[in-house]
Amino acid sequence: MPDNKIITDREEMLETVKKDGTGFALMNASDTLKADREVVLEAVKNNGAALQYADEALQADRELVIEAVRENGYALKSASDSLKADREVVLEAVKNWGSALQFASDTLKSDREVVLEAVKDNDIKGALQFASDTLKADRELVLEALKGSYAAFEFADDTLKADREVVLEAVKISGMALVWTSDTLKDDREVVIEAVKMYVNAYKNSTSGERSAAIRRLLKYASKELQNDPELKKLAKD
């Protein structure tokens, strides 16, 4: 973290932001320098998050904001409302960090191309949670989201969680999709077997003990009847 000294010298500030990789240096600039386009541009090129300290007018500067979100998608949070509704700006942001979708306008959260780009990002829970309800019910998009985030199925529409065909595809991509599947399909032997097969493959380079433990954890989400299925219990032991 930088110290609390306010920098008023333009050349000193330019040198400081060029060397700073944290995005915090601009915080110590004078108000005049926070409104200096060249200073702010240098700052966001190094770390887009510096946009949060820029003058409000520069947070609405389209070219500058694009530079910022290309470097750090999180910078979209600090962009003006008009730029949060700008398709190109938001696309650049979600290409860098899918979950930047949370800062986009509602209209763009309903834009299929924008959301498809966002869900491609590997993130723990992924960007699907920020998509419109309509797109959470989009089969192709949800399956694409699962490729980037094993937990994405949590945010899928309930109709998809109860759709056998969709769930079979989902558990083949990520066995963990079983966690959020409808109770009816947790009692579907083929669905559970496909989820287990995915785990067997995912843990093929692990020890047999690690693989068995992972499968046992997964089977806790199957129906009670299938948890006691001899074939599935054998897979968990092998």
Where are these regions (language model features)?
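Non-catalytic tandem-repeat scaffold regions and their flanking low-complexity/translocation tails
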Residues: M1-D238
